[in-house]
């Protein structure tokens, strides 16, 4: 069992749709066979990911016939009439009804797909210039009639095969280099090899018709969790189905109207019997919601006032488009799609099945499906992209001479995927999603041009309880702490009301902590700049916050920095806005694994060597040797062929370079490993060395060598306190009895008090009682607590009432001092005064 290790168990991702003519498999990735998909080695971090370069061994000889020796820079985009970015954005912004009739079906595909050929497939220079000359002559024709004629000629050239050139004109035009690089990065060359490639007509040895039928459930099974197992594979998804009116999602206005009608029908039902039908509809709706359907899941608000203004090029494309039978077929197909599903195919172990599948569903499947449903309801994005993919497949398989000239099936498969990825942004998003989730990275997907969604399965590298390393290994350098960052992020897609309240409460406590960067600030800033999506304000705030962050300072003190960066003179940016912005930035750094929350580092705190410190092993991901060290040594097999030192000695070199004047890493850890833990300030020689030692402490906590030792407190009530409270209750009871006798009537209070005293007699038999929840204590427990502090001075009694709610064994004293602003000496005085009524627990 290895549930603590990052392993998504994802082997393939598939997009299916359901139409009036039946289900269809639109796209799946990767096209690898069953053996490769289920037995491939998983990489867990980008630093150990290996990149493969594809080489077509069987096609090298044939490629020499039309190789000109021209470099990629010479085959530039100088002859392109318009950029691919502009063309693709114009396609996505066209109305759905006219989208498939536009000029993109021929002309846009011609220059888009040129740059996706392999380097061995470059044609000769003479043929290139001939084609470019012919294209220039066609482009030079002006006027409305000439444009129509050029469109007809291009469509004709697409449908007719050329006898002089193995690659038609539509595969020679210039391409966008950035998009070409993006597609090259998305495709894994190791998949398109003879021993790993699976024919695109099959999905993991299953026929595409079977997978399409399996992943297209009927309407009653849609809009809820879909989970189906075939052999060792799990098909997991969230199928989205349109209603009988073709709506993909109920708008908020329709929801409110339906709720009002349901309430009114219920009210009328009390005075009339003519509303039985309405009541039955209301009962059916409530039954559907109780079954776990997602129609009321909160999604982005609708843009009611958004006005669409097409550009001139889009208007020309729509004006001069020439419909044909093929476009009519795809347009009718687009209009007939009533269901789509992004299905994640997994192969988890039986013992890990529930946890792996639940994590995938909660963190990835639900979020991706909901954002696609929202965009589909707004713009018809999913159906439009499905038609793009199907048209691209049809054009390549039927009209591409270069595709027919390829000999090996894996070469054809790679070329087909290149063309699809270049055409469809949804295919690129699904491919990137698979690559990132498969490698346990964060998938930052751009959907429909302006929608960004980040998906990840959190890596388990933090524990509040020491795991059993013999049964379940963990990553080297995992954090051992009671401050779990996951509790501040939470499962946003599966929060119950109670969990949601706890999550918001954690957000309120967020600014009381410090933030420890998990990498050098320069590296984090570089990563933020590469992952930015032209949001200048957010990038500015994040970069400046990363530069100023220090683990010794509370996050709440950075509100002034946010004010200065935004606009300190603008009255609209109040303290609440700056605080909310600061929380969002901190949560962003935590979610993207750039930082983690800790209590602010101080020389007064106590730190110990973590039991999970990365001492052995050869890398952070080298959990295999941690599990099988003994077995490997018994077999006398070398555990490392490169003769690399273990992690402690690798980090020793880095530590010495960063802190040359401090003791070596093993010596420093030896200083921290005392028999009785002491505050960190005891090992600091002088105040001049304090800053350097605190920086070293932050470095050691970043790599999991040290963890903070916290103090938790319980209140213990002994038998003497119980007897004293019991006597007070008896006195109060006697007074109440005298008052009742003078009134000549008896109430039910005597029976209640007598039963209470019977319970007290049973409780008094115990020596002591620990109050687990002083904030939610009963009346009797409250008397016990006040009795414990009755003999204290007045100032300590006030302090006790202020902090007793935290004495539940869950909130550390170190956090109490930060939260309430209480000096450490005052807390120490209070604990000494309470004496035997306090139970202290040391824990990380």
Swiss-Prot record:
Residues 57-94, 263-273 have a biased composition (Low complexity). The lineage of its organism: Eukaryota, Fungi, Dikarya, Ascomycota, Saccharomycotina. It holds the Pfam family HTH_NPRL3. Residues 103-113, 274-293 have a biased composition (Polar residues). Residues 1-21 form the signal peptide. Mediates inactivation of the TORC1 complex in response to amino acid starvation. Required for meiotic nuclear division. Keywords: Meiosis, Signal. The keyword Transmembrane helix does not apply. GO terms for biological process: cellular response to amino acid starvation; meiotic cell cycle; negative regulation of TORC1 signaling; positive regulation of autophagy; TORC1 signaling. Residues 246-262 have a biased composition (Basic residues). The keyword Signal applies. Residues 297-307 have a biased composition (Acidic residues). InterPro entries: HTH_NPRL3, Npr3. One of its GO terms (cellular component) is GATOR1 complex. Residues 53-113, 246-310 are annotated as: Disordered. Belongs to the NPR3 family. This is Nitrogen permease regulator 3.
